[in-house]
Amino acid sequence: MNFGIVVNISREQALHLARTLATWFDERHIGYMFETLSGSTLGLGPSAPIEELNCHCDVFISLGGDGTLLFTSHHAVTKPVIGINVGYLGFLAEFTQSEMFAAVEKVLSGNYSLHTRSQLEATAFMDGVSHQFRALNDAVLEKGTYPRIPAFIIKLDGELLSAYRADGIIIATSTGSTAYSMSAGGPIIAPKSSVFVITPICPHMLTVRPIVISDDKVIEISVDAPDGEFPLNCDGSLKKMLAPHECITIKKSPVAINLVANEKRNYGEILRTKLLWGREHDGCCS
């Protein structure tokens, strides 16, 4: 079994863990390969570009926060990802630093389970060619630097849902419901629910609220504005600048993400400890 290792090189603790992990693998003659930037920063090898790492490994290890895990999962495709939290929140990264070796040993023994998470797929045309972008958390179309309030036109399966005058629109998966969508007033949704949530960003309308829809729907979004360019971000990464009236479609991706599960944690505990959900000032839920 070979492991692909992706490290948040901006965090010294993540680099320290990576060195420790490489030594641990070497002592046990276990195969591993770093993502190129991680390997060059550490001065360790072998390494390969992130786009090629999937061809050389069976399991991925993410050493960083949720952003590192999102980046890793996009390139892992369906291969298992062990998320070690060396970040601030660590909502998606299942394991603490002290649990790293136990998690790896579980995978080596085959005695592990997976959390399979659905993704969305955004389709846009660039130079006349269709491009697909996957996201585990969300796709966000926003006004960017446009100085006025545009209207975001949303259709479901070809039928008009509404026109939102807002700073942007978030289309989130159930996994992504606790990310940007939640910050914009969207609901918390259990991670294996087969739904999308459509959340407007700062809508200039008192009657507009987030809406939850089945993830078997095809969502079409365009921007009604006389001019300007509007950024499309998938999991926080800029994918395209949309012109007025240019349409993107969003649907459930056929590719799911497999996260190695930490069976010591449950979703309610994660909400309470990471988001302080339901906690009163006296700490009665601690």
Curated annotation (Swiss-Prot):
HAMAP family: NAD_kinase (MF_00361). Belongs to the NAD kinase family. NAD(+) binds at D66, G67, N137, D138, R148, R165, D167, T178, A179, Y180, S181, M182, S183. It catalyses: NAD(+) + ATP = ADP + NADP(+) + H(+). The keyword Transferase applies. One of its GO terms (molecular function) is NAD binding. Pfam families: NAD_kinase (PF01513), NAD_kinase_C (PF20143). Involved in the regulation of the intracellular balance of NAD and NADP, and is a key enzyme in the biosynthesis of NADP. Catalyzes specifically the phosphorylation on 2'-hydroxyl of the adenosine moiety of NAD to yield NADP. It comes from Chlorobium chlorochromatii (strain CaD3). Its cofactor is a divalent metal cation. Its EC number is 2.7.1.23. This is NAD kinase. InterPro entries: ATP-NAD_kinase_N, ATP-NAD_kinase_PpnK-typ_C, NAD/diacylglycerol_kinase_sf, NADK. One of its GO terms (biological process) is NAD metabolic process. It is found in: Cytoplasm.
